[in-house]
Amino acid sequence: MERYMSLKKKISYSELIGSAKANELQTQLQAYVPGKDPNIVVEHEPSKNAAKELIRGDYRWGHQGDDKSETFQLTYSFLESEPDNMPWHITGFSAFNEEQRTAAKLSIQSWTDVANINFTETTDSDKAHITFGFFDASLTGSYAFAYLPSPESKQSGTWYNLKSRTFSENDIGVNGYGRQTFTHEIGHTLGLEHPAAYNASDKERPTYKKSATYFEDSRAYTVMSYFGEKNTRTDFKGIYSSAPLLNDISAIQEVYGANNTTRTDDTVYGFNSNTDRDFFTAKDENSKLLFTAWDAGGNDTFDFSGFTQDQRINLNEASFSDVGGLKGNVSIARGVTIENAIGGSGNDILIGNDAENILKGGAGDDIIYGGLGADQLWGGEGKDTFVYLSAKESPPLERDWIHDFVSGEDKIDVSLFDLGEAGKGGVKFVREFTGAVGEAVLRYDTVNKVNDFAINLGDKFSYDDFWVKIVGEPILESDFILA
């Protein structure tokens, strides 16, 4: 196993030799990755099985061999009176009011969005798989609790302390701690455990330092954790996730299968959202987003255009983005492709994935990096920098197109361009290719008003070389930052 740096020792990068913008991008590509991000203090080693730790006890409805292609059917009910089997250590039953029922249903929906399960409400609480109720006194000091299921289970209850202000109207809304608590306890009823063997009833209060057994045990990765997101470098500024996060989604799909019917059309997250989910929706510049995107198909967009802060938007699966003034508050579930991103009016960094991305920086001095795939790139207003790290990111048959480039303001940066062993001399402009590695040619099509920028990796120019199209007026060699 790869070893990580010891407690409270920061991890440094290898020395970067590119431009300031290229180095900033390179740093962002490694953000939130323990062992690579120098801002992370590693108190526990990362786990390659972090998601599976949530289902280590094999608690579930149904059996291990059940067909995950078939949707698992469950029922739930809100208790209207004290049940005969009310847990021994609590007293003072109360039923959920309408606002609390609505919030709990939204938490249920957030689980069915990602897993191949279906919940149906029933008024027959005796036969419901999962029940909801309040209490107002506990011999053990309970705040909220739920029962884990088993293949032979007939019912699992969730209970919440009504004396806690957490379950008032304000705190059960989106990003509230009460709403997260509903999502957390429902996670237990579906079979998810805490990331490690700790509980609120422990004699000694659990802490990240003493109780976590691996790095990812924080609320940045899972709603099942007791520990704040700052333990793993992210910062949500006091809000809480209303829906399953990165490792929750992987874990619940391992048990019941994935819901592959969720958001199969072209979906927009953030501003102009069509998700019909409050936690995916931004209404104005003061909105706070916190989510992991699970999306089963379509051509999808992260639209963070209404924010004014400097943002870091990464479209790669299992990555974290800094959106709307928070840190690491938006992530993408494993196996999910989000194709497009729109930045705001700050100085943003937009990072594409292997798909054919559309990236729009918006106002501000942005850094745009398409990665692999034939991308369409817009910098928007401001002094923007388009960074390339290798020829694979824009080969002749999958060329990127850069739009709205302004000569003298915007830059194309190849200062960290990988030319291999034969290209130690870097990238240099020439009139015509001679076959030498690193030769660059700039041409302008006066009819179509398109610039062509190409780099030769050796011998004749071929499919393995680099070629990008820049739309607009003629650009100059001085508009490039070379390796």
UniProtKB/Swiss-Prot annotation:
GO terms for molecular function: calcium ion binding; metalloendopeptidase activity; zinc ion binding. Zn(2+) binds at residues 184, 188, 194. Ca(2+) 1 binds at residues 263, 266, 295, 297, 300. Keywords: Calcium, Hydrolase, Metal-binding, Metalloprotease, Protease, Repeat, Secreted, Zinc. Its EC number is 3.4.24.40. Its cofactor is Zn(2+); Ca(2+). Belongs to the peptidase M10B family. This is Serralysin. The lineage of its organism: Bacteria, Pseudomonadati, Pseudomonadota, Gammaproteobacteria, Enterobacterales. The gene is prtA.
